[in-house]
Design a protein with these regions (language model features):
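Karyopherin-beta/Importin-beta family HEAT-repeat alpha-solenoid scaffold
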Residues: 4, 178-180
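A short beta-turn/loop motif at secondary-structure boundaries
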Residues: 95-96, 183-185
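Catalytic core of non-heme Fe(II) oxygenases with the double-stranded beta-helix
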Residues: 100-170, 180, 187, 197
Protein backbone atom coordinates (compact mmCIF):
# COMPACT_ATOMS: atom_id res chain seq x y z
CA UNK A 1 0.00 0.00 0.00
CA UNK A 2 1.32 3.42 -0.91
CA UNK A 3 2.19 5.74 1.97
CA UNK A 4 1.35 9.45 2.07
CA UNK A 5 3.95 11.77 3.60
CA UNK A 6 3.45 15.45 4.41
CA UNK A 7 7.00 16.82 4.69
CA UNK A 8 5.87 20.41 4.22
CA UNK A 9 3.53 20.90 7.13
CA UNK A 10 1.77 24.09 8.24
CA UNK A 11 -0.10 23.54 11.51
CA UNK A 12 -3.31 25.31 12.48
CA UNK A 13 -5.02 24.72 15.80
CA UNK A 14 -8.65 25.57 16.60
CA UNK A 15 -10.65 25.27 19.79
CA UNK A 16 -13.92 26.66 21.07
CA UNK A 17 -13.91 28.17 24.56
CA UNK A 18 -16.34 26.23 26.72
CA UNK A 19 -16.88 29.11 29.17
CA UNK A 20 -17.04 31.89 26.57
CA UNK A 21 -20.65 32.83 27.29
CA UNK A 22 -19.72 33.37 30.96
CA UNK A 23 -17.11 36.02 30.12
CA UNK A 24 -18.37 37.38 26.79
CA UNK A 25 -20.19 40.43 28.17
CA UNK A 26 -17.29 41.30 30.48
CA UNK A 27 -14.77 41.14 27.64
CA UNK A 28 -16.90 43.30 25.36
CA UNK A 29 -17.50 45.83 28.15
CA UNK A 30 -13.77 46.17 28.92
CA UNK A 31 -12.86 46.42 25.24
CA UNK A 32 -15.54 48.98 24.45
CA UNK A 33 -14.58 51.13 27.43
CA UNK A 34 -11.06 51.41 26.00
CA UNK A 35 -12.35 51.76 22.43
CA UNK A 36 -14.69 54.62 23.33
CA UNK A 37 -11.82 56.73 24.67
CA UNK A 38 -10.44 57.10 21.14
CA UNK A 39 -12.72 55.34 18.62
CA UNK A 40 -11.06 53.81 15.57
CA UNK A 41 -7.62 55.05 16.53
CA UNK A 42 -4.74 52.87 15.42
CA UNK A 43 -1.83 52.68 17.83
CA UNK A 44 1.70 52.96 16.53
CA UNK A 45 3.23 54.31 13.34
CA UNK A 46 2.47 52.42 10.15
CA UNK A 47 4.25 53.64 7.00
CA UNK A 48 1.56 52.27 4.71
CA UNK A 49 -1.19 54.09 6.60
CA UNK A 50 -4.65 53.24 5.34
CA UNK A 51 -3.26 50.62 2.99
CA UNK A 52 -2.48 48.43 6.01
CA UNK A 53 -5.27 49.14 8.52
CA UNK A 54 -8.52 51.00 8.08
CA UNK A 55 -11.71 51.70 10.07
CA UNK A 56 -10.57 49.87 13.18
CA UNK A 57 -9.46 50.51 16.74
CA UNK A 58 -6.28 48.72 17.76
CA UNK A 59 -5.45 48.75 21.45
CA UNK A 60 -2.02 48.94 22.99
CA UNK A 61 -0.17 45.61 22.98
CA UNK A 62 -0.68 44.64 26.63
CA UNK A 63 -4.40 43.86 26.69
CA UNK A 64 -4.13 40.41 28.27
CA UNK A 65 -2.07 41.87 31.13
CA UNK A 66 -5.13 43.68 32.48
CA UNK A 67 -5.91 42.30 35.94
CA UNK A 68 -9.61 41.56 35.59
CA UNK A 69 -11.12 38.17 36.43
CA UNK A 70 -12.53 37.53 32.96
CA UNK A 71 -9.29 38.55 31.24
CA UNK A 72 -7.24 36.46 33.65
CA UNK A 73 -9.51 33.49 32.94
CA UNK A 74 -9.22 33.72 29.16
CA UNK A 75 -5.48 34.45 29.43
CA UNK A 76 -4.94 31.25 31.41
CA UNK A 77 -7.03 29.23 28.96
CA UNK A 78 -5.21 30.63 25.91
CA UNK A 79 -1.86 30.05 27.62
CA UNK A 80 -2.61 26.36 28.18
CA UNK A 81 -3.77 25.93 24.60
CA UNK A 82 -0.53 27.52 23.39
CA UNK A 83 1.52 25.12 25.53
CA UNK A 84 -0.45 22.17 24.13
CA UNK A 85 0.00 23.45 20.57
CA UNK A 86 3.75 23.88 20.97
CA UNK A 87 4.02 20.34 22.32
CA UNK A 88 2.03 19.02 19.35
CA UNK A 89 4.63 20.46 16.97
CA UNK A 90 7.44 18.96 19.06
CA UNK A 91 8.45 22.10 20.95
CA UNK A 92 8.46 20.93 24.55
CA UNK A 93 7.66 23.72 26.98
CA UNK A 94 5.89 24.19 30.29
CA UNK A 95 5.55 27.93 29.95
CA UNK A 96 4.75 30.40 27.19
CA UNK A 97 5.47 34.10 26.98
CA UNK A 98 2.54 36.05 25.52
CA UNK A 99 4.79 38.90 24.48
CA UNK A 100 2.04 41.11 23.04
CA UNK A 101 -1.75 41.08 22.89
CA UNK A 102 -4.29 43.55 21.56
CA UNK A 103 -7.88 43.88 20.43
CA UNK A 104 -9.39 45.09 17.19
CA UNK A 105 -12.79 46.75 17.00
CA UNK A 106 -13.68 47.03 13.32
CA UNK A 107 -16.59 48.79 11.67
CA UNK A 108 -18.14 48.11 8.27
CA UNK A 109 -15.51 48.08 5.48
CA UNK A 110 -12.65 48.06 8.00
CA UNK A 111 -9.73 45.73 7.33
CA UNK A 112 -6.20 44.70 8.28
CA UNK A 113 -4.23 44.01 5.13
CA UNK A 114 -1.67 41.23 4.55
CA UNK A 115 1.03 41.03 7.21
CA UNK A 116 3.00 38.60 9.35
CA UNK A 117 4.28 38.53 12.93
CA UNK A 118 8.11 38.36 13.07
CA UNK A 119 9.83 36.29 15.77
CA UNK A 120 6.55 34.57 16.62
CA UNK A 121 6.53 30.77 16.30
CA UNK A 122 2.81 30.74 17.15
CA UNK A 123 0.36 33.62 17.01
CA UNK A 124 -3.32 33.44 17.89
CA UNK A 125 -6.67 35.07 17.21
CA UNK A 126 -9.68 34.82 19.53
CA UNK A 127 -13.06 35.74 18.08
CA UNK A 128 -15.48 37.65 20.34
CA UNK A 129 -18.19 39.44 18.32
CA UNK A 130 -18.89 38.77 14.64
CA UNK A 131 -20.74 42.00 13.85
CA UNK A 132 -23.18 39.99 11.70
CA UNK A 133 -20.59 38.57 9.32
CA UNK A 134 -19.05 35.10 9.50
CA UNK A 135 -15.93 36.04 7.50
CA UNK A 136 -12.90 35.52 9.71
CA UNK A 137 -9.28 35.82 8.61
CA UNK A 138 -7.42 34.78 5.46
CA UNK A 139 -4.01 33.12 5.20
CA UNK A 140 -1.80 32.61 2.14
CA UNK A 141 -0.38 29.15 1.55
CA UNK A 142 3.44 29.46 1.70
CA UNK A 143 3.81 26.53 -0.71
CA UNK A 144 3.85 28.22 -4.11
CA UNK A 145 4.48 27.19 -7.69
CA UNK A 146 1.33 25.38 -8.84
CA UNK A 147 1.73 24.47 -12.50
CA UNK A 148 -1.53 22.67 -13.14
CA UNK A 149 -5.17 23.37 -12.42
CA UNK A 150 -5.76 20.04 -10.68
CA UNK A 151 -3.47 20.82 -7.73
CA UNK A 152 -6.07 23.17 -6.27
CA UNK A 153 -8.31 20.17 -5.56
CA UNK A 154 -6.07 19.12 -2.68
CA UNK A 155 -3.92 22.20 -1.94
CA UNK A 156 -5.66 25.55 -1.81
CA UNK A 157 -3.71 28.78 -2.32
CA UNK A 158 -5.55 30.47 0.57
CA UNK A 159 -7.50 29.55 3.68
CA UNK A 160 -10.29 31.70 5.14
CA UNK A 161 -11.67 30.94 8.59
CA UNK A 162 -15.24 31.31 9.77
CA UNK A 163 -15.77 33.93 12.46
CA UNK A 164 -17.31 31.93 15.30
CA UNK A 165 -17.49 33.82 18.61
CA UNK A 166 -15.51 31.98 21.28
CA UNK A 167 -13.18 30.26 18.80
CA UNK A 168 -9.40 30.37 19.20
CA UNK A 169 -7.16 29.93 16.17
CA UNK A 170 -3.43 29.32 16.69
CA UNK A 171 -1.08 29.49 13.70
CA UNK A 172 2.57 30.16 12.76
CA UNK A 173 3.20 33.88 13.01
CA UNK A 174 5.31 33.88 9.83
CA UNK A 175 2.30 33.07 7.65
CA UNK A 176 1.01 36.00 5.62
CA UNK A 177 -2.55 36.70 6.74
CA UNK A 178 -5.19 39.41 6.78
CA UNK A 179 -8.56 40.47 8.13
CA UNK A 180 -10.68 41.03 4.98
CA UNK A 181 -13.02 44.04 4.81
CA UNK A 182 -15.76 43.65 7.40
CA UNK A 183 -19.11 43.07 5.72
CA UNK A 184 -21.31 43.11 8.81
CA UNK A 185 -23.49 46.01 9.94
CA UNK A 186 -22.27 45.92 13.56
CA UNK A 187 -18.82 46.06 15.14
CA UNK A 188 -16.47 43.10 14.77
CA UNK A 189 -14.39 42.42 17.90
CA UNK A 190 -11.45 40.07 18.35
CA UNK A 191 -8.22 39.55 20.28
CA UNK A 192 -4.82 38.83 18.74
CA UNK A 193 -1.54 37.85 20.36
CA UNK A 194 2.05 36.81 19.75
CA UNK A 195 3.78 34.08 21.74
CA UNK A 196 7.14 32.43 22.24
CA UNK A 197 7.85 29.23 24.20
CA UNK A 198 10.14 29.40 27.20
CA UNK A 199 12.51 26.47 26.74
Amino acid sequence: MIKINTPFYVPFFERGCEFFEDIRDDLISIIMEIHNKDPFAIQGNFPKGKLLKYNLTESNSNFLQIEHKSIKKIRSWINQNLIDSYKTIKIETQKVNIKSSWFHVTKTSGFHNMHMHPNTPLAAIFYIESGNSDIGNSWINPITGYIDSLSSRWCQSTFTSKFVPGKLIIFPGWLLHSAPPHQGDKLRILLSLNSTPII
